Amino acid sequence: MTTHTTLRAANVARQREWDKEGWIDAAYRGNELAGEVGEACNVIKKLERERHGIMGSRATVGELADELADVIICADLIAMQYGIDLDAAVARKFNATSEKVGLDTRFQPADR
């Protein structure tokens, strides 16, 4: 079982608890994802600010890890809503980009 497969199972179970009425739709999910991407970008800005010695608030790589995890969770929730197999989609897109730009590296999910 891949990490993504395990995440999907956990997302399915948690959504039954979180959204008992089933009202969360794709528009909500899209806004949720955008918010999490924005939070990740804000942490990156703070990390870069510190790297360049610019005054202002700081962040940690641990905070970035948390925000990126939220992005992945939200992306999976959207994929779940539309019945998308993210393992297959990621491999397909990664490999298509490699082919398009003439690179040899290909991605194959571990359990395929």
Question: Which residues fall in each region the model found?
Answer:
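Flexible "arm" and connector segments at domain edges
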Residues: M1-R112
